[in-house]
C-alpha cells in the first residue's frame, strides 16, 4: 500500500493534481490548495454549480440536528463524504453532485445513544494494494474499510462483527480493542455484547473525526459525550488505536491516561486514573509521514468545569502528543492546559508547515486554541519555537478543587483575540463612555483574568458566575478551523470573542441517569450562567451575538452600542509564523445593518468617528490558495456570502451570495479542468464554480 502522498512543506503531488485527499487537504491541517483558476479577477463570477442535500438526494434521514460538519475528500476523480446521524458514507459525482453510492452501518444501541452521531467530519482515504480504500469511524465506534469505487466492504479485511446486518468482512469493533485491558471493564467479568457495548455506568465512547492513514497504519481517535453536560465522574479513557491498513489487524494502543509505570502517571492523584476518562481526540489528527509521526490533539478529562475528584495536572489531557506511527510510543508532548476545568479542549488539528525563524529552518507545528493562543513547536522534537512562560494562575474557592499554581503561556505570537476581560478591553470612544462601560462591567462582575475558575453557588463572597473568557466556544474552535499558506508560513485564524458565565451547583440537583458513570460528582455546571454576552442583552433581532451587547432597554445611555468590550466580536487574523508577528485583522463578516445604525445613532457618539462593523459572532469556514483566502460570512443585509480575501492585506477582493452559511471549513478540487469550491451547509453541500 502507498498512502496519500503529501509533502509536509508544500502542497504535495496530490494537490498538484487538483485533489483534496483528506478533510484538511492532506496530512498537514493547512486547508491549502495550489489551485488558482478562481482568483481575484473572476471571483465575483462564481455561481452555484450544484447542490446536494442528504435527505432529498440520498434518502438519508437527518435526525433532529442537521449536520453541517463534514467535508468531502476528492481523490482519483471521486468525491466522497459522510452525512446524517448514522454517518452514511456517500460518493457524489464531482461535476453534478449526483449520488453514486452509499454505505450505511446497521443500527445498534451503541449508535442510537451516541451524543456525537451528527458530528461526523468526513472520511479518510488510502491506497491498499493498488486499490483506493475509504475508511470511516462511526458513532457506534466501529471502523469500516470500503472500496472507494463501489462502497462495498473490503474483502479479507478486519473480521466479522457478530451483529445482525453487519458485513462479513471489512469491519473492526474498535470498542472491543479499546477496553480489552481496561480494569473497570475486565473487573465486571461479564460477556462482551458488541451490539450494546459496555454499561453506561462505566463509560461510553464514540467518534466524530475520521481516522488518519499514515505509512500503512490507520490511526483512530475518538470522542465522548460533551463534558459540559456531565454530572458523574466515571468514564472510559479515549485511548488512541492503530490498525494495519492492509489487513485491519490491531497494532497498538496509546493510553491517554497513563497507567502505573507509564510517563505522566503521577499527574493523576486520588487513583482517578483507574475510573475516570475522556481525554479523547475529537478534533482531526495531523501527521508527518516522512518523520513517521502522528500528532494527537486531546480534550480535557471527565467533567469540563470541576475536577476535584482528579487532583493533579492530568496528563495527557488538553495536550498535543506526537506518537511514533509504527509503535504508538510517545515521542514528545506538551500540555497546553493543566488540570483543565475551563472546557479548553484542543479544538482543531495541528497545522504543520516549515518556517524560517531567525535564519533557521524549522519543521513547525502550530496549535490554535480556545484560549486565543497559538502554541508553536518544532514538530520533530517538541521544542517550543519561542519561549513559554509558566505564569501564576488564579486559584479556585470551590470546595474540593485544587488548581495548578501556574499555566503555560506562549510569549509569541501575541494572542489573536481578547483573553480575560480587563479595563484595557473596555470601549473608550470617549471618557464618559469608558466610565459607563467600567461601571457596567463592575456591576455585573465581568472583569476577570484568563483562567478565571468557576465559582460555586452559596460561596462565602457572594460572587456570581465566573466570567470565563474566552468561553468554551473559543477563541478558536472546530467550527472554524484555521488555514495556512505553507509557501509563506502565514497562518489564518478565525475566532470569536464570546465568554461563558459559569457557576457550579451540587451535581445531584441536575443529575441525568442517562449520562455515563455511576458516582455523582460533588459539583457540576448549573448554578447559573452559561454562554453569555459580555455585558448583558443583545441576543435579539440584529444583535451582534455572543461577543456582547449593552442592554437595550430604556434609560441605558449605552443603548445601541454592541458591547462594552472592544470588538470585533468575530474576527479573522493573519500571523506570519516565521516571525510571530500579526499581519492583519479583519471582522468576520459584517454586523447587521440595523445594529450598525443603532450603534451610530447613540447620542454619546455624536461627532465621534466609530467603526460600526464589529463582524459577527462565531467562526468563518476558510481555506487558502496561492492568491486568496476563502471565507464564509454574513453581509450587513443578513445574506450568507463567500468572500475572497487578499492574503497579504486582508482586503476583500470579491463576494458572492450563497444559498446558506457554511461552517467547519471549505474544500476545493479540479474536475474536468474546472475548479469547484464546496461549502458544507445544513444537511448537505453547495458547490461553487465559474460559469
Where are the language model's segments positioned?
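Bacterial N-terminal signal peptides
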Residues: 1-9
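Mature N-terminal segment immediately following signal peptide/propeptide cleavage
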Residues: 12-57, 72-74, 382, 573
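N-terminal pre-domain segments of enzymes
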Residues: 12-38, 405-439, 525-549
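Repeat-blade elements of multi-bladed beta-propeller folds
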Residues: 20-24, 64-88, 114-142, 203-232, ...
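Short, solvent-exposed loop/turn elements at domain surfaces
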Residues: 27-34, 56-62, 81-82, 89-90, ...
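Short, polar loop/linker segments at the starts of domains and inter-domain junctions
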Residues: 30-42, 60-68, 267-270, 467
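Extracytoplasmic/lumenal domain signature
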Residues: 44-57, 89-113, 143-201, 233, ...
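Long, low-complexity segments enriched in small/aliphatic residues
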Residues: 407, 411-498, 571-574
Amino acid at each position: 500500500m502507498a498512502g496519500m502522498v503529501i509533502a509536509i512543506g508544500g502542497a504535495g503531488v496530490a494537490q498538484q493534481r487538483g485533489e483534496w485527499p483528506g478533510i484538511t487537504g492532506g496530512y498537514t491541517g493547512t486547508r491549502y490548495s495550489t489551485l488558482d483558476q478562481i482568483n481575484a479577477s473572476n471571483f465575483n463570477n462564481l455561481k452555484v454549480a450544484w447542490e446536494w442535500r442528504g435527505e432529498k438526494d440520498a434518502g438519508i434521514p437527518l435526525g433532529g440536528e442537521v449536520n453541517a460538519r463534514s467535508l468531502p475528500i476528492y481523490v482519483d476523480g471521486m468525491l466522497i463524504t459522510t452525512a446524517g446521524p448514522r454517518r452514511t458514507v456517500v460518493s457524489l459525482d464531482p461535476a453534478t453532485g449526483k449520488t453514486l453510492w452509499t454505505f450505511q452501518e446497521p443500527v445498534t444501541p451503541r449508535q442510537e445513544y451516541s451524543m456525537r452521531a451528527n458530528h461526523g467530519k468526513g472520511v479518510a482515504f488510502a491506497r491498499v494494494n493498488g486499490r483506493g480504500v475509504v475508511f470511516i469511524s462511526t458513532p457506534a465506534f466501529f471502523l469500516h474499510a470500503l472500496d472507494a469505487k463501489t462502497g462495498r466492504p473490503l474483502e479479507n479485511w478486519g473480521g466479522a462483527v457478530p451483529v445482525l446486518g453487519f458485513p462479513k468482512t471489512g469491519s473492526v469493533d474498535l470498542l472491543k480493542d479499546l477496553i480489552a485491558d481496561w480494569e473497570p471493564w475486565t473487573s465486571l467479568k461479564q460477556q462482551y455484547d458488541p451490539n450494546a457495548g459496555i454499561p453506561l455506568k462505566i463509560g461510553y465512547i464514540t467518534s466524530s473525526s475520521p481516522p488518519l492513514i499514515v505509512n500503512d497504519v490507520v490511526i483512530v481517535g475518538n470522542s465522548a459525550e460533551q463534558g459540559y453536560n456531565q454530572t458523574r465522574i466515571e468514564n472510559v479513557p479515549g485511548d488512541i488505536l492503530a490498525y494495519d491498513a492492509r489487513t485491519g489487524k490491531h497494532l497498538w494502543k496509546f493510553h491517554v491516561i497513563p497507567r502505573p509505570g507509564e510517563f505522566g502517571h503521577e499527574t493523576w492523584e486520588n487513583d482517578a486514573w483507574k475510573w475516570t476518562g475522556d481525554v479523547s481526540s475529537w478534533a482531526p489528527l495531523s501527521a508527518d509521514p516522512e518523520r513517521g509521526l502522528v500528532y494527537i490533539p486531546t480534550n480535557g478529562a471527565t467533567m469540563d468545569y470541576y475536577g476535584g475528584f482528579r487532583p493533579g495536572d492530568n496528563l495527557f489531557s488538553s495536550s498535543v502528543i506526537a506518537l511514533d506511527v509504527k509503535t504508538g510510543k510517545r515521542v514528545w508532548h506538551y500540555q497546553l492546559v493543566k488540570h483543565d476545568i475551563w472546557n479548553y479542549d484542543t479544538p482543531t488539528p495541528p497545522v504543520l508547515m516549515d518556517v524560517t525563524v531567525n535564519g533557521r529552518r524549522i519543521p513547525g507545528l502550530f496549535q490554535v486554541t480556545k484560549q486565543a493562543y497559538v502554541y508553536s513547536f518544532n514538530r520533530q522534537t517538541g521544542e517550543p519555537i519561542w519561549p513559554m512562560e509558566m505564569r501564576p494562575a488564579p486559584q479556585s474557592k470551590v470546595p474540593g478543587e485544587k488548581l495548578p499554581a501556574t499555566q503555560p503561556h506562549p510569549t509569541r505570537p501575541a494572542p489573536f483575540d481578547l483573553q480575560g476581560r480587563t479595563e484595557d478591553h473596555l470601549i473608550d470612544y470617549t471618557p464618559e463612555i469608558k466610565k459607563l462601560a467600567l461601571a457596567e462591567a463592575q456591576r455585573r462582575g465581568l472583569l476577570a483574568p484568563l483562567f478565571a475558575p468557576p465559582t460555586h453557588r452559596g460561596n462565602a463572597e457572594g460572587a456570581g458566575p465566573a466570567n470565563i473568557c474566552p468561553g468554551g466556544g473559543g477563541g478558536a474552535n472546530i467550527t472554524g478551523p484555521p488555514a495556512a499558506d505553507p509557501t509563506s508560513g502565514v497562518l489564518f485564524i478565525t475566532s470569536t470573542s464570546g465568554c461563558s458565565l459559569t457557576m457550579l451547583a451540587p451535581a445531584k440537583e441536575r443529575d441525568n441517569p442517562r449520562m455515563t458513570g455511576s458516582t455523582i460528582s460533588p459539583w457540576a455546571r448549573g448554578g447559573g450562567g452559561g454562554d453569555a454576552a459580555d455585558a448583558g442583552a443583545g441576543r435579539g433581532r440584529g444583535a451582534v451575538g455572543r461577543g456582547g451587547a449593552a442592554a437595550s432597554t430604556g434609560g441605558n445611555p449605552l443603548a445601541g452600542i454592541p458591547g462594552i468590550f472592544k470588538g470585533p466580536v468575530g474576527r479573522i487574523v493573519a500571523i506570519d509564523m516565521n516571525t510571530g508577528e500579526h499581519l492583519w485583522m479583519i471582522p468576520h463578516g459584517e454586523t447587521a445593518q440595523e445594529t450598525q445604525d443603532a450603534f451610530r445613532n447613540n447620542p454619546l457618539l455624536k461627532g465621534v468617528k466609530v467603526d460600526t462593523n464589529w463582524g459577527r459572532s462565531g467562526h468563518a469556514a476558510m481555506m487558502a490558495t496561492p492568491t486568496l483566502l476563502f471565507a464564509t460570512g454574513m453581509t450587513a443585509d443578513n445574506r450568507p456570502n463567500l468572500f475572497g480575501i487578499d492574503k497579504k492585506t486582508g482586503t476583500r477582493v470579491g463576494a458572492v451570495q450563497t444559498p446558506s452559511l457554511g461552517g467547519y471549513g471549505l474544500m476545493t478540487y479540479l474536475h474536468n479542468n474546472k475548479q469547484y469550491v464546496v461549502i458544507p451547509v445544513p444537511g448537505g453541500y453547495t458547490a461553487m464554480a465559474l460559469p
